[in-house]
Amino acid sequence: MKNLTLSIRHETLYRYEKPVGYTLQLLRLTPRTEIGQRIQQWEIKTQGKRQSSIDAFGNSSDMLTLAFPHQEISIIASGLVEVQSPDRGRMPDIVPISPLVFTVPTRLTEPTETIREFSSRHLSAHATSSQLISLAEAICSEVSYQSGATATESTADVALALGKGVCQDHSHLFIACCHTLGIPARYVSGYIDPGDVEHSASHAWIDVWIEEADYAGWISIDVTHACLQSARYCRLAVGRDYESAAPIRGIRRGGGTESMSVNVKVRDIGR
């Protein structure tokens, strides 16, 4: 598959019932610098002050501070990113961090007994790429895609019990299954070019560590679509789960009831 240049625009608007005195938000809205992904141009527009840094997982992040009264926050991230389709989903890692870091369960990916039983039917140690795709298919069969069925704080176990969820839940359940066997797996947040079909352009998938005859390293799998990552995907951040890779997380003082609207548009400029 040829390289794609993705045009991305991600708009987030927060509105508050009453004035907010102070807001602190962590933004992971700049695409990662990786082999096979290159930023051609990118900007983030918002009020307040931002301090940029690179976190322990190699993600670009901005700490946004609004230390004045406000009743809305507008955050717009946009630009062009050139993406190359990885060979068989393989993702050479430029961040010198042990994959064992991604074998530690979190609150969202804790492998409960129910998950262990499910995993035992669909996953084995030293699983191959095709076997991991089969696990993704089993997860999609067990947890049907339904927007609004879960919340950002929902655990993998909750999604499995409900039998429905979204890409975040599919990813968390896949990671939890890997944890049952000590297989490193990590959460990826980013964007997908939906093409000509209806699909949320903001997306989540996973990287999983494999050891095959000719390769030991990460491969990237879109659990929701049970396929390997291609050039249609732009990677924002990786982490142990949603909480450590979310595009926006924050706290505030005051404001009362909050409403949030999000609009994400992704397209291949060559299409």
Predicted regions and their residues:
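Linear, non-domain "peripheral" regions
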Residues: 1-117, 182
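A broad, low-specificity signal for short, low-complexity segments enriched in glycine/proline
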Residues: 3-7, 34-42, 146-148, 164-170, ...
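Generic structural hydrophobic/aromatic packing signal, biased to beta-strands
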Residues: 8, 27-29, 44-46, 77, ...
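Ser/Thr-centric signal marking residues that sit
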Residues: 12, 150, 224
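A generic structural motif
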Residues: 16-18, 124, 212
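Residue-level preference for alpha-helix termini and adjacent loops
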Residues: 19-21, 26-28, 63-65, 101, ...
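Secondary-structure boundary elements
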Residues: 83, 93, 97-165, 173, ...
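Hydrophobic/aromatic-rich core segments of domains that either
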Residues: 169-258
